[in-house]
Amino acid sequence: QRIQHIRDYCEEIRKTIERYGEGFAVFDQDADYQRSIAFSILQIGELSGGLSEEYRKATSSRVQWGPMKGMRNLVAHSYGSMNREIIWETAVNDIPTLKQFCEEQLAES
């Protein structure tokens, strides 16, 4: 169930990028865009923290769970000063890979 929710937030990020437009310049200038992406990343980090230690260890070669939780903390505790470049890079580079992983896991179950 958590993997399904993580996948859903990955899809939300994809849809948000599709809606607002690709490119950091667009993202950097739109606070709503930033908040939407950041919220989904925060939720993904929160959900990943609830996965069993056994599962995280078993899948650690495919997903870096620790940094994901770290991103959650970065977003949650940035108090308006989050690093937009890191958020953007996560959204466009890491989230598609995570989504693919989740889809594979869901197909196997």
Where does each model-flagged region fall?
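Solvent-exposed interaction patches of small proteins and small membrane subunits
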Residues: 1-109
